[in-house]
Each structure stands twice: as C-alpha cells, then as structure tokens.
C-alpha cells in the first residue's frame, strides 16, 4: 500500500525473489521467523526484531513456518528530505536483546506509529514528517564511515534490476540470456558474471526456478500438465517434468495428488494476522489521536416555512427492536430492559430468533414419531410481549433438533440448530399448530397485526453452512411455510429472506429468491434484509493489494460512511427492476458492526452513528430494527463484567449505553423535516423546532480490517479516523418573533456515556448493586435551559467533539 512515498506490505508465508529498492526497506518481525538475505549476510528475524536493507542493496526473503513480517519501504524522496547522504549504507539489525535499548525502542515505536497513522487517514504532511524522522534516525545512528556504495556498483545493480524486471514480466515467453543482454546493450558474458556475483546462480537457473514457482501454483487447478508446461514458458511437457523432478523430487502429477490430500486434511485454525500485528502496535505512540488543527466549520442558513410544510417524518427506527432469542425474553433482566425501553422510547414490534429452538420445547414427538406441541414457554413470552404493548415479529426458526435434517450450529448454544427440515409435512404441521394456537389464544384480528418470517437465507449462502441447505432447499421451506400460513388466513403476513447486504445485492442472492418464489405463487408480503456495513476484501481493491496473500477476518467493515443509505438505495432499484416496487422493505437487523465483542460500540461512537444513520435513512425502509436491545445474547457464553462490546443498547446489568440515550433523543423529533445536511438536521411540530447536531467519525482502516485488536477499554477511542472538533453555525430564519424556551441536550464523553463514566471509575470489573445504581444515575445527557429572545431569526453556534451529538429544542413561550 503506497501513500506519500511510503509503502507498507505484510508478508505472510511469502518469499521474495532477488530484488532491491531505491529507498530503504525495514522488516519488522511479527510472528515466527523470516530470513532476509543480502550478499553480505543472512538475518533471521523473529517477533519484534528489525532489520533495515540499505538503498540499492539486493536482498531476498524466505518465510519460516507460519511466519509474518511487515515491510516498510521509505522512498528516495523521503531519504532526501531526511538529508540521507547519497549512496549511504546502514547496518541496522535489532534483535530481541535490544528491547531495553532506548534507540532500538525508538525505531520500533516510530515504525508502529507510522503504520497506525497511515490507517487513521492522517494528512500527508504529518505522515511524511514521521517518515522523514524515522529515516533521519536510521542514518544518523546506524551508518558507518566506510558504508558508502561506489557509484559503479550502484550502476551495476540498476542494470541487474532492469534484467530482473524483464525476467519477471516475460518469464512465460521465449526469453534468453542473449536477448536480455542485447536489450540492455551489454555482452552476454557481462550479464552472466553479474548474475553469478549478485544473485548467486546462473541466468538460466533463475529463469527455470521462476517458471517452476508459477507452475506449482497452477497445479492447484485442473489444467493438464501439458497446458501448464506451455503456459509457463517450457518448450515441452517432458522438459517441464524433468526440471520439476530435479527441483521437487517427484513428477508434477504426483505433486498434484499430494496437494489434494493436503487440502482434504483440515488444519487447525491459525492465528489471525491481526493478532500478529499487535506485536508491532504495542510500540505505537500513545499520544492523543484527536487533531489539534482548527475545527471544521459548517455554516448554513435555514429558512422555516410559514406554514406547516415539510417532508413528513416516519419514525421507522421505533417500529421494531430485537432481543436475541425467544428464551432470552423469559429472563427477568431482559424483561426489565424491555419495560424501560417501552416507557422511555416506545417500540411497536419485538423480533427475536429461536421460537422453535429446543429450549422453547414447542416441537415434541411421540415414540412413533408423530408430532405434538407444547406452548407453555411460548405463552409466557407472548403474554409478556403484549402486556407491555409490543407486537410479536415472529421468526419461524430455527429447526427443532428432532425435525432437523442436519444437526448443525455455528454457536456455543446447543439448542440452536440450523438446518433444513427432514419432513415437509411435519414442518407444515408445526407452523399450522403454532398459528392456530396463537389465533385461538389472542384472536385473529390481533394475530393479523403480527409479522412472520422464516429464518435467514444467509445460512444457505455462507461458506461455513454450505452443507446445511441449498438455495433450492431454502425456497422450498419458504414456499411450504407461505402455503401453510395463507391457508389459515390470507391476510397473515410472511416476509423474506433476511439477507446480508452482500447476498442481497448479488445476482444469485435476494433477486433470485424473490423471482423463484414468485414463480411458484409465493411472493413475500414484505422484503426483509439485515444491514451490517461489511464487505469482502475484493470490494476494496486498494486494501486487496495490501492483504491479497494474508489471512484475516473474512469480512471487513466498509469504508463507506453512508453504507446503509447506499445499500437501501441499491435495494430499492432491484425491487423496481424485478416487479417488487410496491413490496415494503423491512431492515430486521441493523447495527454498525457484526462483531460481538467490539468495545467501540459501547462508546459515544454508537450515539453519533445512530443519529446520523437514522436521520439519513428513516424514509428508506418501513422498519429499521436495531440489533439489539440488550447485551444478553445466548449464542456465545455471556461475558462477565459490565462492558464487553456487546450489540446491546443496555449492558447485561441494565445500564443504558450512549446509543440508548441517542434513541431517546430521537424520540423528540418533529413531525416534519425542514432541512438537513452533513452533521445537522432540523424538524418541526407546530410551534416547536428540533435541531439535531452530530460529529460522526468513521473507523480507521487499521480497525476496519481487524488489524487493530481492541481489548483494553481505555483504547476504545483509538480506532477511529483522526479528526478534530466540528464547528456548526446555523441561522434559523422565519421564526415567529418572541421569546423561545431553548433546551440543549448534550451527549459526549463527559455526559450521557455510561462507558466513559465507568472509565472514570477506573473500569472496575466487579461492581456492587450500589455501583451499578450510581452508573445508571450518572449516564444521563447534559441538559441546559435558557430563554432566547428573537425578532424572527436565531443564530445557533456550537463546537462538537468527535462522536458528540446534541439536540436543541426551541418552543415559543405563550404571550
């Protein structure tokens, strides 16, 4: 990855053939052992060890078992700015024995800080300043008086570099020593001597080895040995086989068999590259990450209409909220959090997984295999839901183990079984029995308000669930469910298919599902999706270059700050194209991350993310179902302590997080939108004006790609792009003259964030009931009230910290 004449490259199981750089390359050991060889020496570097290769020095790298190293290359332009003497060489090898040496530690710190600054989108000036400082330290402390390369030696190396470039670009063509020498205007014997001296082998041997390395990779595919031979520049398959046997000790065919056997034998999971990079990042400068530059300024004049004109606001974010599983809804602390949320925010629907899971005990079988049904636990749940004024949004899943075709779960909880049914008639009997029971108990008119779905189609597409069910299986399940429900009552509503964005937008994803079930007479009554801003490596070509040979998380957070808006706009285009324009969209799950242990989600970041995304997307879908209300999620072992980075608006102890307080603020929104822009939104209800201000800062690339682990709660704010304060000036014109009561509600690290109050308490892991009560009481936004006298215009001016949100409510006083 290249930025400002600085190149970062993570090498993982990757060998570099003979090469050289015009600048200086530093190799920082991350994991295992890597060997860097020059003409003078071989250096094996392990974790936290550093070796620097001088400019115009030939080197090669060889990876040890499960090894990783970070290469940082500083360009000649950087060296020049550092006053690096021309042709100056250095001798810098920092073993682990130098961990107590101040200069060596300074080199490590500068490498780590430079790496982190790049990923935090630091401006070019600061990035280059740090790089120049590192280069200056290298030559001033590690150069020697006799370490200057002769000019003629540099010219020879440049010639060799040109020859190597020709070989590496024409290796699969007819290329020879004579042709290469002719193109470089030197003799055959001269090129031959240079190769022998600097590369340590002959021109022909180097070319054959390069061709073999490409051929080995091709043997992983299905092409014939003959095709591979000619594709890689060998004159015949016999020539290829002879060279291959000399190098690898077996024929290409035998080698391919060994590859297949190796692929069929599963390997235990290895450490993530993100774990390795902690070896580097532990040395990063811990200084404040917030910019000290002048604040960004937004100035806007907003003219209020004389009438109640304006775009109506649909409070789609209050239409639905999620808890994890049906069984979770029977837990006292979860019920208390639901009661509080209903009182302070007021949602319409409650969604959850697992109504058919074994721990709800609905599906039972007699000894002869005939089904019977037990609704004791389900009745307790649905009675409670309706008691607190919520409407059930019932996901029909997962699969009861006795009805499962495959016993499979991706979670720690054995009650969760993800599978196709083993008997269509029994599945339909289960669905019919449930619907009939609920209609008998709660009344048809009531149940018609409920919403039903089948569990997500993601499980038919995600790689780790490939054996569980196919696309065709999923469509059959949906169609069987649809027919059963509509047979009971045509006005009951069934939606699908709950796809992640990548699956929803894929040609063979949601589009295919909708067309297939429509063709069979089972079109969903509403379209459901799950919106997490994740993308594949291949969708980010810039980073793909950096990590193309790495192992990391299979999904990364999108760099698109407006991911939700763009995803829903694309989804609406698809609906139009395939004849589903009138079919409502429900975002049944929605969060800033798919990671269940993301401490940044406990911070003020989540408040700014929610305010920004709700105000951008409230009109893009009928429901925006936040995932989820509580940190209590019985998929994995529920961690101890108060804050662990769970999805919830509440901790498991019932402490409201900053995101919850943001939704409370949104509950004050007006009936109509007046105007909006990046960082601000103005609404109105009769003679009351609501102004929302927010300073959203996105994750930096280092964290988006999971190259920054977040385990220390004190580091939770170190994973965002470096940004300063935001100054917003709004001129509200067209107000009725008079005195206005001005309420100002502020949510930032000083007020409204339980996480930051917890940090102030020294982040205690064990908290008494009194401690929790104190934290709950202190986790309130700051409120200031004053009177503002206006002759028809009001000037609002404020500065926001990163992740800060504010609500200003203006209400004209009577008289």
Q: Language-model features: where?
A:
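A hydrophobic/aromatic-rich effector-binding and dimerization subdomain
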Residues: 1-5, 57-122, 135-146
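Generic protein-terminus/edge-of-domain signal
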Residues: 1-44, 239
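Short acidic-glycine-tyrosine-enriched beta hairpin
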Residues: 40-55
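Short, Lys/Arg-enriched, Trp-marked, Pro/Gly-tolerant hinge/linker segments that flank
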Residues: 93-102, 120-127, 136-165, 169, ...
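Short, basic, alpha-helical segments at the C-terminal edge of helix-turn-helix-like DNA-binding modules
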Residues: 154, 207-220, 254-269
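Basic/polar phosphate-binding segments, predominantly the helix-turn-helix DNA-binding elements
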Residues: 166-168, 173-210, 229-251
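Non-catalytic accessory regions flanking glycosidase/transglycosidase catalytic cores in CAZymes
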Residues: 239, 254-395, 402, 406-451, ...
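Noncatalytic carbohydrate-binding groove/subsite architecture in carbohydrate-active enzymes
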Residues: 470-616, 620, 642
């Amino acid at each position: 990855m290249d930025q400002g004449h600085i190149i970062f490259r993570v090498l993982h199981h990757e060998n570099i053939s003979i090469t050289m750089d015009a600048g200086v390359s530093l190799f920082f050991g991350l994991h295992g052992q890597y060997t860097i060889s020059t003409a003078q020496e071989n250096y094996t570097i392990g974790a936290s060890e550093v070796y620097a290769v001088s400019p115009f020095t030939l080197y090669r790298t060889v990876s040890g078992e499960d090894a990783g190293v970070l290469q940082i290359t500083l360009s000649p332009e950087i060296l020049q700015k550092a006053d690096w003497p021309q042709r100056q060489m250095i001798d810098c090898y920092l073993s682990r024995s130098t961990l107590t040496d101040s200069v060596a530690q300074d080199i490590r710190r500068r490498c780590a800080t430079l790496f982190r600054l790049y990923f935090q989108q630091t401006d070019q000036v600061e990035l280059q300043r740090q790089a120049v400082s590192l280069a200056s330290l290298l030559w001033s402390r590690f150069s020697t008086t006799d370490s200057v390369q002769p000019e003629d030696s540099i010219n020879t190396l440049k010639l060799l570099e040109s020859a190597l470039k020709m070989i590496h670009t024409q290796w699969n063509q007819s290329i020879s020593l004579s042709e290469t020498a002719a193109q470089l205007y030197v003799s055959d014997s001269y090129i031959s001597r240079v190769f022998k001296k600097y590369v340590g082998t002959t021109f022909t041997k180097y070319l054959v080895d390069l061709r073999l390395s490409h051929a080995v990779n091709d043997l992983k595919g299905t092409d014939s040995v003959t095709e591979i031979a000619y594709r890689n520049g060998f004159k015949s398959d016999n020539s290829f086989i002879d060279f291959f046997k000399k190098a690898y000790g077996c024929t290409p065919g035998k080698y391919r068999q060994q590859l297949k056997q190796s692929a069929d034998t599963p390997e235990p999971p290895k450490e993530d590259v993100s774990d390795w990079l902690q070896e580097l990042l532990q040395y990063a400068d811990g200084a404040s990450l917030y910019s000290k530059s002048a604040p960004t300024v937004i100035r806007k004049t907003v003219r209020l209409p004389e009438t109640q004109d304006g775009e109506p606001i649909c409070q789609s974010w209050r239409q639905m909220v999620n808890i994890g599983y049906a069984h979770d809804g029977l837990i006292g602390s979860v019920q208390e959090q639901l009661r509080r949320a209903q009182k302070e925010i007021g949602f319409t629907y409650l969604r959850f997984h697992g109504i058919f899971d074994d721990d709800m005990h609905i599906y039972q079988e007699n000894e002869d295999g005939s089904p019977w049904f037990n609704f004791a636990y389900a009745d307790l749940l649905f009675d409670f839901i309706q008691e607190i004024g919520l409407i059930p949004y019932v996901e029909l899943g997962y699969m009861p183990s006795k009805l499962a075709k495959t016993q499979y779960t991706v979670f720690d909880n054995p009650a969760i079984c993800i599978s196709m049914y083993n008997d269509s008639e029994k599945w339909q009997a289960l669905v019919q029995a449930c619907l009939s029971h609920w209609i008998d108990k709660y009344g048809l008119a009531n149940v018609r308000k409920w919403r039903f779905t089948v569990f997500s189609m993601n499980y038919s597409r995600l790689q780790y669930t490939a054996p569980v069910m196919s696309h065709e299986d999923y469509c059959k399940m949906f169609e069987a469910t649809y027919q059963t429900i509509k047979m009971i009552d045509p006005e009951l509503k069934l939606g699908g298919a709950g796809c992640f964005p990548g699956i929803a937008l894929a040609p063979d994803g949601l589009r295919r599902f909708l067309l297939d079930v429509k063709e069979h007479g089972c079109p969903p009554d509403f379209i459901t999706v799950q919106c997490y801003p994740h993308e594949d490596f291949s969708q980010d070509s810039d980073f793909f270059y950096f990590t193309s040979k790495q192992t990391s998380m299979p999904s990364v957070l999108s760099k698109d700050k407006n991911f939700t808006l763009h995803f829903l706009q694309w989804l609406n285009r698809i609906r139009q194209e395939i004849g589903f324009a009138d079919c409502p969209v429900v975002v049944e799950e929605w969060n800033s991350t798919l990671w269940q242990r993301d401490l940044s989600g406990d911070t003020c970041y989540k408040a700014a993310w929610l305010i920004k995304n709700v105000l951008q997307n409230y009109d893009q879908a009928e429901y925006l179902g936040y995932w989820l209300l509580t940190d209590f999620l019985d998929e994995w072992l529920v961690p101890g302590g108060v804050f662990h980075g769970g999805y919830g608006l509440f901790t498991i102890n019932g402490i409201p997080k900053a995101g919850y307080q943001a939704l409370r603020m949104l509950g004050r929104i007006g009936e109509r939108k007046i105007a909006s822009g990046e960082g601000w939104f103005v609404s109105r209800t009769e003679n009351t004006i609501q102004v929302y201000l927010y300073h959203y800062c996105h994750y930096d690339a280092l964290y988006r790609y999971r190259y920054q682990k977040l385990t220390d709660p004190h580091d939770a704010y170190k994973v965002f792009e470096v940004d300063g304060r935001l100054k917003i000036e709004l001129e509200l014109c067209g107000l009725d003259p008079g005195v206005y009561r001005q309420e100002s509600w502020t949510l930032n690290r000083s007020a409204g964030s339980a996480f930051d109050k917890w940090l102030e308490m020294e982040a205690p892991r064990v908290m008494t009931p009194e401690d929790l009560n104190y934290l709950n009481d202190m986790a309130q936004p700051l409120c200031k009230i004053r009177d503002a006298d206006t002759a028809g215009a009001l000037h609002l001016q404020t500065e926001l910290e990163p992740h800060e949100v504010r609500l200003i409510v203006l209400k004209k006083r009577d008289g």
